[in-house]
Regions:
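Early extracytoplasmic/lumenal segment of secretory-pathway proteins
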Residues: 24-92
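A ligand-binding cleft/hinge motif common to bilobed small-molecule-binding domains
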Residues: 90-93, 214, 219-237
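Short beta-strand->loop
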Residues: 101-110, 122-125, 220, 236-248, ...
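Mature extracytoplasmic/periplasmic domains
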Residues: 257-317
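A bilobed periplasmic-binding-protein/Venus flytrap-type ligand-binding module shared by bacterial periplasmic
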Residues: 133-140, 176-179, 250-263, 281
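Conserved C-terminal helix/tail region of periplasmic/extracytoplasmic solute-binding proteins
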Residues: 313-338
Length: 338
């Protein structure tokens, strides 16, 4: 009997000291988009990272403004995410209020390989860039647009689409149009009046415009080059144009939250995002332009994305300054565009 008790005691001790697998596994919470982005992110980034570091990466899908609202509500010391990724216009306020960790290139050495324009303040960085221009159906019988002003051509009446001001592409489009029809990028009265006159279909997500183009609900739309090239890659008869007046940039920005309990892993995930392998995957599969200047792309992909010779031409706005005036611009937009 004594031997049996000893054996049971030994088994309990062995079981209690054995590794508990998933029960001890760290979970890293990151934000990301759905759809095709999610597919490429899982294959190129998440699965290899989980395997290498024995962690669980939980991806919260949505849009930048939703994630920032959740972060601000939770407070800087108890963030719902370890890694916050999205469009830059949503981030100046939480950055100013100390929600983000200082950039760490010892944990993420690929930061040293970024174009200087990709560094934002002391906390953040752009991982990918896309150019905002005009996308049109090549089978619609309309002429190829060359200028932003072509958006107002009568041939597109009822068949053109853009975004609400809350969308990053939407406010960039508003700025460009404000300069064309007014005094400068921030002559919002002129820009809103011009867009109102065009009476476009208005959406809040770029994926919606991609569906509109695919289903031929519209034949001309404001869209980034990456989204257009993805449509073309799937056999949709569309083409993208860089209007003659210039193309603003849609930047995909990332940072580690200050209150994260997993900062070292969080920065390592960002380093993986910036690696030539992952940057190449996003360029090849989704046509997002790498911000890591050491990335060497296949020639057929390099022709479709931003290259070293394009960097000086990029139109990047000071979103920290924009954030101070955005509420009043949004109020005007909502009042005029109802």
């Amino acid at each position: 009997m004594k031997g049996a008790v000893t054996l049971v005691t030994l088994l309990i001790a062995l079981l209690s000291s054995a590794p508990r697998g998933d029960a001890q596994q760290t979970t890293l919470v990151v934000t990301g988009y759905g759809g095709r982005w999610s597919e490429v992110m899982k294959k190129a980034l998440v699965e290899p990272f989980e395997k290498k570091h024995n962690v669980k990466v939980e991806v919260v899908t949505g849009i930048s403004t939703e994630w920032v609202a959740k972060l601000m509500a939770a407070g800087p010391d108890n963030p719902p995410f370890d890694v916050l990724f999205g469009n830059e216009p949503a981030f100046p306020i939480p950055r100013e209020r100390g929600f983000f960790d200082k950039r760490d290139d010892t944990l993420a050495p690929n930061i040293k390989n970024l174009y200087p324009k990709a560094l934002i303040g002391e906390t953040s960085l752009a991982m990918f860039w896309g150019r905002i221009g005009l996308t049109y159906r090549t089978d619609s019988g309309i002429k190829k647009p060359v200028s932003w002003k072509d958006f107002w051509d009568d041939a597109y009446t009822g068949k053109r689409s853009t975004y609400v001001i809350g969308n990053t592409l939407g406010i960039n489009f508003l700025f460009v149009i404000s300069k064309i029809f007014g005094k400068d990028y921030f002559d919002i009265d002129a820009g809103v009046a011009a867009i109102k006159k065009a009476q476009p279909k208005l959406v809040d997500f770029s994926g919606t415009i991609e569906k509109q183009l695919e289903q031929k609900e519209v034949v001309l739309a404001v869209l980034h080059d990456a989204g257009t090239n993805d449509l073309k890659n799937r056999g949709i008869p569309v083409d993208w144009v860089a209007p003659s007046e210039g193309t603003p940039i849609l930047d995909q920005v990332v940072q580690v939250t200050r209150g994260s309990k997993n900062k070292e892993l969080a920065w390592k995930l960002i380093d993986a995002y910036l690696s030539p392998e992952v940057q190449t995957a996003f360029a090849t599969e989704l046509f997002w332009s790498p911000t890591n200047k050491t990335v060497k792309l296949p020639a057929d992909v390099a022709r479709k994305v931003i290259g070293p010779g394009d960097i000086d031409k990029l139109v990047l706005f000071d979103w920290a300054q924009v954030a101070k005036q955005r509420p009043q611009w949004t109020e005007k937009w909502n009042r005029e565009m109802r």
